[in-house]
Structures are given as structure tokens and as C-alpha cells.
Amino acid sequence: MTDLTMLTIAQARDSLKKGDFKATELTEAYLQAIELANPILNAYVAVTAEQAMRMAAESDNRLAKGEAGILEGIPLGIKDLFATYDVHTQGCSYILDGFKPKYESTVTANLWKDGAVMLGKLNMDEFAMGSSNETSYYGPVINPWRKKGSDEKLVPGGSSGGSSAAVAARLCVGATATDTGGSIRQPAAFTGTVGIKPTYGRCSRWGTIAYASSLDQAGPIGRDVRDCAIMLRSMASFDRKDSTSVDLPIPDYEKCIGQSIKGMKIGIPKEYRLEWMSTEVIELWQKGMDFLKEAGAEIVDISLPHVKYALPSYYIVASAEASSNLARYDGVRFGLRMPGKDIVEMYEKTRSAGFGDEVKQRILIGTYVLSSGYYDAYYIKAQKVRTLIKNDFDQCFAIGVDAILTPVTPTPAFGLADEKIKNDSIAMYLNDIFTVPVNMVGLPGVSVPAGLSSSGLPLGLQLIGKPFAEEVILQIAYIIEQAAGTFSAKKWWP
């Protein structure tokens, strides 16, 4: 029998329905792969082996009765930001040490309803704050990719680095992730996987640990475009428990795969051409335009004049919302509690010990921009800029642009021990320069691998769509995928 971990979601789904193998066999193959590789890659922070085998056995029963859901028997990894009933959920932060929720997030509940199997919880940057998966309390995740002729450890991107690394290393068929400023798309680009950040409101945020509530959105990371389409259909839903959830029909995203894009207008924003950007990324961007032109699309130049202000505005808004959301972690009701002579000292010691440096930095920034005298100067101004950025995108779509093509990141994955980036917050934040405008406006965006750098590392292109037009950007992403091919890391781990 072929290595079952090499199958995509679509291939595994079809084979399970035909009875080529059982869900328990597929799940066991992944659990064995995790046991060997996780000590090296550190993608999982908790492995739920017994629960996985139980869920797989239930899937086999439903498959035998012809009652299969759209993800029946498919083993998935779950980012540690999603609440999973009675299973370790900490946002990879020490302050939530030992927390096991007595409720299930809407996104994961949707997946289980459709027959998916949970392999475990995936590593991530603490509270989703980071671009390299180095801020996790459980240590960094190692990218399965390596440069040609080098054994240097590379970052997998962040904050969903565990999700992207696990998918790339065949430690799950697909994974849930979240995206506040690029945390699905950037890790996908760094690991040669596909990741889609849906429109804000498409997937419920209920039961997902909040970072910045007006920016957070759940989405899938998969091995190819079709897999992301299949997962997104299950993850998306209207949810009355989430006041920002949108009550719109959920399309069968897989049906758009393979459809023609002839006559579509693809916008190329001039503001994304940065002087310091890698020439390889510029060449890849041009190659992506050529792929789409050959498929019958029309390439048009557009302008998004206010996106140059997106990154600083994003870090003001995100930090402000984070400082408010993280105020709930006080050691009183759940998670870590440090001893103190009174409640104030207990608060101080708990939060000081429980939060990592990056989280503390963002809380301090957020508290500052929300403080008296600075609220108008920073937070209100950032929200006004956000409106201007939205207007720029609205104007482009109003003139008939169907989607916008940009790079995902200015460079390929960088080294885990890259002190130049590690010790420079601005350099780290610049990893999100092409992705944050999408979150500021709430639009859908997908990252698709489009080539390799000269050092053999994957590079991705981003497609940005109109609100709730995920099927359009998936349709276009599939064209790029077919032209560029798919990319797999050469296995060096056990």
C-alpha cells in the first residue's frame, strides 16, 4: 500500500468512500508519522491519539452505512487557538497553563460534524502574536524546508507555523489556522502549502481565543487549492453566538476548481513594488501575471495609495484590541495563578510570569495608544486610515477588477537563528507588509505556491478578492497551481 500520508484530502476522501483503506488505518499512519517527526519539528503541542482513533472508528461505521460527511475520516491538526472540549487549549501561552475548555469552538464543531478526525493541537506564536513561531511557550517550530546544501533551521512563518509545518511535513492532511495580519498566508508561503484567509465574518470566531477581534479570521491550510476549498466549506458557517458572523449561503467551493478565468480582470497594485524587495519575488510576481494572462485573464495596473499606511495602522489597531482582550487573563478564574500577598500582587506576578516578551510589548503598545491624550492621536487616526484603505480597494473592484495579485512575503523563509531579524521588531513586522491590508479591510486572500527561490525555498503569490468571493480567488489560485506545480520539502526528518 502506498504511504497513506502522501494523499491529499480529496484523494483520501475518495479512497475512503471506495473502501481502499479504513479511516483507522489512515489515522494510525499519521499518528506514527507524528511520533517520529514531532520531536524534531515541534509542530504539535498535544497529540490526542486515543481520541483520534475513536473518532476514526466512528467514521468507519458511518462510511460503512453510506452516511459519510464531506470530511469523513480525514485526520486534521487543530491550531492551539481553537477551543476543543476537554483538550489542552492554551494559545501556546504559559498564562493558560493546564486550561481544558468545557466547550467546543464553532469551527471545530463544524469539522467534527462533517466527520473529520482530530490528531492533536498545533504549535503557534503565543496568542497568535508573531511571524516566525518563535514566541510559543512550547518552543519554536522547525520548517520542513531547507536551503540547498544547508542544514540551517528555518522558521515556518507565523503565527500558524505549527499548522503550515505539519501540513508540509505530512503530519496531518490539513490544518486549521487563523489570520489576523497574515498568519495563514505567510506561513503557507514559507512552507510551500496553500492557505486561505476568508472574508471577515465567513467563519465564526466563537470559541477561538481572541487576539484582535476586528481582524481575526479562521481558515484552512492545505497541500493544494482543492483541499483548502473542501476544508473551507466545512469550517464556514453562520453562527448566532458570534455577532460578527455573516448570514450568507456557503458555496461548494470545490465546484469552482478548474473553471475558466478567461475575461477576468486581475489588478496589479503599483504600491506593492518595493525598492528593497527580493528580485526573485519580483520575477515570481511577473511569472504569476504571465500564468494568468496565458489562461485568458486581463492584467491591469491599479493603485492603492493608502496601503503604505496599512502596516503601522495595523499594529496600532491590533495592539489596542489585544491589550483589551488579554485583560481577562488575571489568574482568578482559569489558567496560571502566581501567589501574592494581595490580589494586586497576584495579578502582577501572574501576568508578568504568564505572558512572553512579544505579548507584553503589544499589550504595552495597545495600552499606550488607548490611553487618555493618545487615543485620538493614534487609535482614532489608525481607524480613519483603515477606512481610506477600504475605499481604495472598493474603487478598484468598482471598475471591474475581479481579483488582485501580489506577492505574499518580501523574502522566502529566514533562519531560526537570524539575529538580524530576531532582534529587530520592525524587520519582523515587515514580513506582513503585503498581507495586513487584507485584514484591515476584511477581504478574502489566498496564498498559493508559485515557484522556488535560487536557494530552493518556496515562494508564494497572494490573490485578494471581493467580499465573500472566496470561490473566485480559489478558482484563480488553481490556475497558478496548475501552471507552477505543487512543491514538497525533501524529507530529512525521521
Swiss-Prot record:
One of its GO terms (biological process) is translation. The active site is at K79 (charge relay system), S159 (charge relay system), S183 (acyl-ester intermediate). It is an enzyme of class 6 (ligase). Signal peptide: none annotated. Gene3D superfamilies: Amidase signature (AS) domain. InterPro entries: Amidase, Amidase_CS, Amidase_dom, AS_sf, GatA. Keywords: ATP-binding, Ligase, Nucleotide-binding, Protein biosynthesis. GO terms for cellular component: glutamyl-tRNA(Gln) amidotransferase complex. It catalyses: L-glutamyl-tRNA(Gln) + L-glutamine + ATP + H2O = L-glutaminyl-tRNA(Gln) + L-glutamate + ADP + phosphate + H(+). Its EC number is 6.3.5.7. Belongs to the amidase family. GatA subfamily. HAMAP family: GatA. Allows the formation of correctly charged Gln-tRNA(Gln) through the transamidation of misacylated Glu-tRNA(Gln) in organisms which lack glutaminyl-tRNA synthetase. The reaction takes place in the presence of glutamine and ATP through an activated gamma-phospho-Glu-tRNA(Gln). Heterotrimer of A, B and C subunits. This is Glutamyl-tRNA(Gln) amidotransferase subunit A.
